[in-house]
């Protein structure tokens, strides 16, 4: 907002219209050509009223839906004059003289003062012209332009002063529009001209220098804005204008570089000049840095010469910001240059102690950092005092910087620390990485840790893989059958992809262990992992149980289990047992058939007996239970008793011994439920009673631990180790849910 304040002193209308005219310059010019009898102002008003829609305005005019503003003919003449001025200013001709002859002489004298001081400052600053070849080229162009514009600017500045004096909208507004039409920069220049003209009374001298500083700023910023070659070019060309014609016109052109800069930067310009050398080093332009150093010194001398400019100078903290920004913005380019830019910055600091990065950085905390011209106005008074301090500090710091110049690269990193320290380190690193197009620390670390990360990744994936192997054995069903029951989806490709990706990712992902690296391995492990991993963490010995149940499960699980995609808990299974309704062939596979259940129950009972003997009964039972999704599903939903929670995903997994007993109970109860088709499997005892005849031993052993069903010790917090975790069979509902 602060950037706009001065704009509205004299230029509120001009810039408001100027902005519109800038946006609608093409439409407006077309309309002016199409309807020469219409006033540009009227057309502009129509455009602004109709969202700058050329077609709508033409339609309105052609259909006489809109009529010219007839009554005000005098204003039309004035507007015509404005048009002339705009066209003249657009062409860059010095037409302002017609509007103000005496004002030209008066403003010309003011402009001459500006030119003298500006030239003095520019003479001290000429290396800036050398800073950019583009600047030199466009400087030549704009020097010519500035020559024309100097006449026009003397006239326009005179006219702007006249507009201040008499008809502020007339020349400056039309000039602003005309400049806006051809070039926003010119509008800015005239606007800035009107600004200095407004300031001509007492601030005219200060303002021209400020403008010079702005031009310098922008020239400096241009290296900063190398990413923004347009602005930098305009700004560079503008510095030429400022240098050859330090009149307000020349200054406004650098303002043209950035509209906000044209408005507010006057306060900044010198600080940016100071900042300018800094950004240049960051862009690693040592040649420019040296002139910038020279320039920065004259800038400070000028600043010292004029406290008002010093008030402008306080923006030096933004200078820090800008170098910071420049590394950020130009980090890509600067990273390549970073090795150069920072040492150049340090050497420049030595050469240019006046650019006090450390002190300004230190002060940046105290001084409100303003990026761009936003906070310039608000910060001016404080910044003025602080700028004085900055100058003194910079003077003090100059020897310090010389001393610190060697240290400075580190200090810059440190003082920029929040901004640059890591970025600079990363820049050096990124110099390597940018070549590879890698910037993120993660990538760097990955490159650095590529050796270490594969293991880490494996560990990470293993971390989940344990869950997945243990908790999602559901996943290990036949690949074809994985979602077979789930309507409308063919998950085979996804399963294969998931398997391949997971297998590539980590051993956990290799779902020969869990889901199965391949369909063959997938089926195999569906047998084994479902049986073994379903209940057990890989910690428990699964080999015996897996082997025991592998044969049984091989025939059954391959057909029976529907795995969710790798690592994916079958949530829809929780809510919708889509694959588990007989649709998936699960029921057809015989989950519903108590025969398999009984067979599995007996087999599981056998394995459970051996497992109990091995303390692995948990794996045995769940292997059996998992092996038949019916069992796993029963354990999940079908037996709410298992952990006194019918929500398997949230019940705490029992410790393995408890798991063994509880899973025996649950698994057997489920088995018994299937075998006995007891809906009462909710009561494990009932299901166990069904099984009790089959497995009195296990029941006795299991009853020894009746509570473990409620095991509150989560081995894996929210995750159950059980294949139950994802499984629900149609049996689940047959079992008596419904």
Swiss-Prot record:
Pfam families according to UniProt: CUE (PF02845)
Acidic residues compositional bias, start-end: 202-216
Function recorded in the entry: Recruits the ubiquitination machinery to RNA polymerase II for polyubiquitination, removal and degradation, when the transcription-coupled repair (TCR) factor RAD26 fails to efficiently displace stalled RNA polymerase II. Also involved in telomere length regulation. Binds DNA.
Record's keyword terms, sorted: Chromosome, Cytoplasm, DNA damage, DNA repair, DNA-binding, Nucleus, Telomere, Ubl conjugation, Ubl conjugation pathway
Post-translational modification remark: Ubiquitinated. Proteolytically cleaved by the proteasome in response to transcription stress; the resulting N-terminal form constitutes the activated nuclear form and the C-terminal portion is degraded.
GO CC entries: chromosome, telomeric region; cytoplasm; nucleus
Gene designation per UniProt: DEF1
Organism placement in taxonomy: Eukaryota, Fungi, Dikarya, Ascomycota, Saccharomycotina
Protein name: RNA polymerase II degradation factor 1
Compartment annotation: Cytoplasm; Nucleus; Chromosome, Telomere
Record family assignment: Belongs to the DEF1 family.
GO biological process, one term: DNA repair
Region (Disordered): 1-25, 73-306, 372-460, 587-711
Biased composition (Low complexity): 16-25, 91-109, 148-164, 394-460, 595-630, 647-677, 684-711
Organism: Candida albicans (strain SC5314 / ATCC MYA-2876)
């Amino acid at each position: 907002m602060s950037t706009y304040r001065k704009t509205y002193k004299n230029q509120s209308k001009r810039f408001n219209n100027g902005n519109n005219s800038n946006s609608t310059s093409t439409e407006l010019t077309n309309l002016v050509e199409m309807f020469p009898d219409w006033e540009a102002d009227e057309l502009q008003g129509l455009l602004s009223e109709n969202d700058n829609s050329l077609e709508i305005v033409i339609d309105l005019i052609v259909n006489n839906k809109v009529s010219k503003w007839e009554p005000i003919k005098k204003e039309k003449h004035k507007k015509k004059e404005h048009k002339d001025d705009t066209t003249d200013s657009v062409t860059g001709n010095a037409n302002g003289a017609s509007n103000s002859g005496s004002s030209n002489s008066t403003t010309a004298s003011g402009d001459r003062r500006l030119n003298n001081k500006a030239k003095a400052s520019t003479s001290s600053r000429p290396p800036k012209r050398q800073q950019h070849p583009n600047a030199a080229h466009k400087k030549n162009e704009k020097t010519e332009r500035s020559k024309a514009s100097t006449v026009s600017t003397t006239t326009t500045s005179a006219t702007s002063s006249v507009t201040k004096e008499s008809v502020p909208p007339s020349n400056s507004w039309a000039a602003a529009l005309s400049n806006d039409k051809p070039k926003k920069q010119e509008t800015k220049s005239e606007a800035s001209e009107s600004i200095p003209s407004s300031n001509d009374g007492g601030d005219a001298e200060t303002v021209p220098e400020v403008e010079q500083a702005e031009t310098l700023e922008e020239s400096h910023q241009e290296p900063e804005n190398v990413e923004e070659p347009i602005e930098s070019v305009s700004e560079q060309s503008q510095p030429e204008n400022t240098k050859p014609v330090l009149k307000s016109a020349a200054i406004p052109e650098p303002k043209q570089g950035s509209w906000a800069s044209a408005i507010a930067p006057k306060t900044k310009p010198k600080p940016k000049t100071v900042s300018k050398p800094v950004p240049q080093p960051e862009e690693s332009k040592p040649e420019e840095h040296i002139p910038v150093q020279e320039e920065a010194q004259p800038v400070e001398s000028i600043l010292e010469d004029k406290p008002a400019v010093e008030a402008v100078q306080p923006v030096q903290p933004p200078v820090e910001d800008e170098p910071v920004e420049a590394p950020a913005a130009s980090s890509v380019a600067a990273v390549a240059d970073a090795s150069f830019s920072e040492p150049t910055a340090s050497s420049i600091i030595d050469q240019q102690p006046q650019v006090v990065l450390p002190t300004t950085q230190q002060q940046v905390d105290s001084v409100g950092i303003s990026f761009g011209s936003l906070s310039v106005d608000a910060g001016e008074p404080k910044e003025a005092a602080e700028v004085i301090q900055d100058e003194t500090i910079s003077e003090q710091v100059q020897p310090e910087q010389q001393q610190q110049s060697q240290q400075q690269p580190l200090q810059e990193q440190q003082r920029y620390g929040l901004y640059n320290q890591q970025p600079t380190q990363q820049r050096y690193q990124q110099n390597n990485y940018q070549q590879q197009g890698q910037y993120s620390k993660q990538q760097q670390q990955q490159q650095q840790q590529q050796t270490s990360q594969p293991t880490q990744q494996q560990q990470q994936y293993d971390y989940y893989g344990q869950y997945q192997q243990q908790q999602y054995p559901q996943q290990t069903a036949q690949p074809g059958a994985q979602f077979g029951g789930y309507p409308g989806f063919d998950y085979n490709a996804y399963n294969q992809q998931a398997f391949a990706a997971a297998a590539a990712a980590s051993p956990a992902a290799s779902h020969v262990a869990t889901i199965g690296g391949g369909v063959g391995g997938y089926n195999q492990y569906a047998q084994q992992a479902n049986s073994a991993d379903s209940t057990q963490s890989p910690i428990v010995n699964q080999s015996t149980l897996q082997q025991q149940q592998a044969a049984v499960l091989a025939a059954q699980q391959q057909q029976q289990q529907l795995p969710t995609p790798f690592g994916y808990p079958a949530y829809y299974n929780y809510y919708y047992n889509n694959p588990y309704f007989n649709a998936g062939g699960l029921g057809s596979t015989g989950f519903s058939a108590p025969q398999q259940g009984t067979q599995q129950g007996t087999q599981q009972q056998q394995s459970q007996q051996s497992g109990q003997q091995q303390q692995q009964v948990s794996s045995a039972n769940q292997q059996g239970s998992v092996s038949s999704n019916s069992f796993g599903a029963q354990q999940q939903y079908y037996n709410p008793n298992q952990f006194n929670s019918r929500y398997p995903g949230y019940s705490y997994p029992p410790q393995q011994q408890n798991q063994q007993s509880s899973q025996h109970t649950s698994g057997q109860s489920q088995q018994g439920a299937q075998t006995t088709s007891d809906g009462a499997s909710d009561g494990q005892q009932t299901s166990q009673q069904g099984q009790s005849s089959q497995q009195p031993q296990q029941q006795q052993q299991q009853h020894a631990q009746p509570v473990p069903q409620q095991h509150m010790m989560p081995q894996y917090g929210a995750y159950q180790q059980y294949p139950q975790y994802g499984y629900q069979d149609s049996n689940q509902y047959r079992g008596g849910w419904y």
